[in-house]
């Protein structure tokens, strides 16, 4: 997908990018490739692939009508090089984006990226999702949590649901749809007072299948969740 094809596809779906937004995506690509030589950010570095598999893939929640250009507080867990939240932030500048990542080198990249792209209302924190979720400044503070290919729902729900306000939504972006994954996660979702609201399936322009599971938080999360760092993975709920 060339940048031109990227713009055209967005245009067909009612999103007209300004020259500034096009420049932001271009600069994002340049910095991603440049920094990838120093720290491992992505295996995808060819320009057309980045525009398809990182940029276009990341804005799926926008294209699927799950996010609009309001000042929603959005948390991105395990964003790596900023996916999916920062491409959405470029398109919808009103979003207030927070990223938590366990690798400080990636946080340094994201800080530089945000500065270079002139993004405001973006906040980056180095640490574990399990730890920040017990902090009052983060717990139950977000309207939306996004996670792209981070973990199975059984684990992911414990890492993300505590951050949501009641009525807030987790958007889990995945490349494969395993009905048994949601079946396995039933107990975890019940314990966390949350419910699968939707399971969307669509395809990238090259035909690759993609899925977004939407989970809504129904009641406050019990204080004991999430458990200590590492536990959700070792002993899923």
UniProtKB/Swiss-Prot annotation:
<comment type="similarity">
    <text>Belongs to the methyltransferase superfamily. RNA methyltransferase RsmG family.</text>
</comment>
<dbReference type="InterPro" id="IPR029063">
    <property type="entry name" value="SAM-dependent_MTases_sf"/>
</dbReference>
<comment type="function">
    <text>Specifically methylates the N7 position of a guanine in 16S rRNA.</text>
</comment>
<keyword id="KW-0808">Transferase</keyword>
<dbReference type="GO" id="GO:0070043">
    <property type="term" value="F:rRNA (guanine-N7-)-methyltransferase activity"/>
</dbReference>
<keyword id="KW-0489">Methyltransferase</keyword>
<keyword id="KW-0698">rRNA processing</keyword>
<feature type="binding site">
    <location>
        <position position="148"/>
    </location>
    <ligand>
        <name>S-adenosyl-L-methionine</name>
    </ligand>
</feature>
<protein>
    <recommendedName>
        <fullName>Ribosomal RNA small subunit methyltransferase G</fullName>
        <ecNumber>2.1.1.-</ecNumber>
    </recommendedName>
</protein>
<feature type="binding site">
    <location>
        <position position="83"/>
    </location>
    <ligand>
        <name>S-adenosyl-L-methionine</name>
    </ligand>
</feature>
<keyword id="KW-0963">Cytoplasm</keyword>
<feature type="binding site">
    <location>
        <begin position="129"/>
        <end position="130"/>
    </location>
    <ligand>
        <name>S-adenosyl-L-methionine</name>
    </ligand>
</feature>
<keyword id="KW-0949">S-adenosyl-L-methionine</keyword>
<feature type="region of interest" description="Disordered">
    <location>
        <begin position="218"/>
        <end position="237"/>
    </location>
</feature>
<dbReference type="GO" id="GO:0005829">
    <property type="term" value="C:cytosol"/>
</dbReference>
<feature type="binding site">
    <location>
        <position position="78"/>
    </location>
    <ligand>
        <name>S-adenosyl-L-methionine</name>
    </ligand>
</feature>
<dbReference type="Pfam" id="PF02527">
    <property type="entry name" value="GidB"/>
</dbReference>
<dbReference type="InterPro" id="IPR003682">
    <property type="entry name" value="rRNA_ssu_MeTfrase_G"/>
</dbReference>
């Amino acid at each position: 997908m060339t940048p031109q094809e990227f713009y055209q596809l967005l245009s067909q779906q009612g999103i007209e990018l300004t020259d500034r937004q096009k420049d932001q995506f271009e600069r994002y690509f340049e910095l991603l490739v440049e920094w990838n030589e120093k720290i491992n950010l992505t295996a995808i570095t060819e320009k057309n692939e980045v525009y398809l598999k990182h940029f276009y893939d990341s804005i799926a929640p926008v294209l699927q009508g799950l996010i609009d250009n309001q000042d929603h507080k959005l948390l991105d867990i395990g964003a790596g090089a900023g996916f999916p939240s920062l491409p959405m932030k470029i398109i919808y500048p009103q979003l207030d984006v927070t990223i938590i990542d366990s690798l400080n080198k990636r946080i340094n990249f994201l800080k530089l990226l945000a500065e270079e792209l002139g993004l405001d209302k973006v906040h980056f924190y180095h640490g574990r999702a399990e730890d920040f979720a017990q902090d009052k400044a983060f717990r139950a503070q977000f309207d939306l949590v996004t996670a792209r290919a981070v973990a199975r729902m059984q684990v992911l729900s414990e890492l993300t649901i505590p951050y949501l306000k009641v009525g807030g939504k987790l958007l889990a972006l995945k490349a494969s749809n395993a009905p048994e994954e949601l079946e396995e996660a039933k107990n975890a979702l019940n314990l966390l007072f949350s419910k699968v609201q939707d399971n969307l399936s669509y395809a990238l322009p090259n035909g690759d299948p993609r899925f977004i599971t939407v989970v809504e938080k129904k009641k406050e999360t019990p204080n004991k969740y999430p458990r200590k760092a590492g536990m959700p993975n070792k002993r899923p709920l």
